Amino acid sequence: MLDFDLVLFGATGDLAMRKLFVSLYEIYTHYGFKNDSRIIASGRKELSNEEFLTLLCEKTQLHSREKGREFLAHISYLCVRLDNPKDFEELSKIATKNKPLIFYFSISPSFFATTAQHLAKNALNHANTRLILEKPLGHDLKTCKEIFQSISVFFKEEQIFRIDHYLGKKGVQNILELRLNNPILNILWDQISAVEICVYETLGVEERGEFYDKIGALRDMVQNHLLQVLSLIATDLPNNLKDLRKEKIKVLKTLQPPKDFKKQVIRAQYQGYRDENKVHKESQTETFVAIKAFLDTPKFKGVPFYLKHAKKMPHNQASVKIHFNAVNTLEFFLSQDKITLTLKDHQNPLILETHNKQEFLRPYAKLLYDAIQNNHNNFAHQLELEASWVFIDTLIEGFMNNATPLYSYESHHLNESEFLKPLYQ
């Protein structure tokens, strides 16, 4: 039975309704909550408990699921306007101090500093307090640091959990699990010749045109998800997993800026992107990006890491393919629990199984559970973010200076091998 209180800012928003409440329900069905554990849903709208629960049930159908009504009994609603100090005073009257108190910031980063300040002023930044922060955590290195500095006045690094749902995916979890539990693979790890990290989507920007046009594929996917996966592959495994984040920081700090943009970076935009709703008619935003990156470490010096992400592709793909010197390949499928090992002397790939046979929580549920347990392993440290932004900023500067042209590609018909030929030469 889990014992905690969670305050969810932005409880009436899209993410909360689509992912967060369902994930909390999933945790409840797996582990149970103590009777006095509470989920305090917070939003700007003035709603009664009954009105909010009606809205929640309309969006999620939780009331019709097994144990759904039991779970809903843990939820109450409180109107908290983030710019209203009196609302935080009301929150402080019902928030607990004798067990983990988790604040989930499912709100715009522009409200992070104000919200953190109000929590601190009302003595809600005690030793049991934890903050879960949603991306985007900055637009570049400068804004990333500014966000952290505005919060760190009131909360310590060990109280902050920066959520990246990719780190909760079973396929990503398998990377670390396989490395920890297979000594033979660790021998192979010294013989890696190339790594391909790929996330392709058939969908376009859909209803996110205005948001996406400001960030593009590089910021949306590479800066966080793909670089986090890279760090899990390239890090030296510590004796204590609590030191994993320190090792990942070391790896990300060794990312080398491109020496030849045109041979190391390809960017493109799908045809028709500029006709999407709320997208600028002369937009230079990339919907396809492929990077040939290098690390300056003894083990991986000269080993290319291909980071690839695109929208409106012919097929969906989320995978990590590791190539070894002896023509062997190891492939992780990030959206499913599947790992294949292809050996040069075997005609058919070997399907590897992971040791963890327990039913796996979905990404947001897995990460919420980790935060409740005060486990930071699957959350990025501030220094990880800063190291990744140092690398990404060099690419953004290159884009702004047109160091590599913005190509165009036909939706769902891109010939990947031909398009990426400069990277693999």
Curated annotation (Swiss-Prot):
Active site: 225 (proton acceptor)
Binding of NADP(+), residues: 44, 135
Pathway(s) annotated for this protein in UniProt: Carbohydrate degradation; pentose phosphate pathway; D-ribulose 5-phosphate from D-glucose 6-phosphate (oxidative stage): step 1/3
Keyword vocabulary terms for this entry: Carbohydrate metabolism, Glucose metabolism, NADP, Oxidoreductase
The protein's Enzyme Commission number: 1.1.1.49
GO molecular function: glucose-6-phosphate dehydrogenase activity; NADP binding
Keyword Oxidoreductase attached: yes
NCBIfam families, sorted: PRK05722.2-1
Entry-linked PANTHER family: GLUCOSE-6-PHOSPHATE 1-DEHYDROGENASE (PTHR23429:SF0), GLUCOSE-6-PHOSPHATE 1-DEHYDROGENASE G6PD (PTHR23429)
Task performed by this protein: Catalyzes the oxidation of glucose 6-phosphate to 6-phosphogluconolactone.
Record-given protein name: Glucose-6-phosphate 1-dehydrogenase
Organism: Helicobacter pylori (strain ATCC 700392 / 26695) (Campylobacter pylori)
Taxonomic classification: Bacteria, Pseudomonadati, Campylobacterota, Epsilonproteobacteria, Campylobacterales
Gene field: zwf
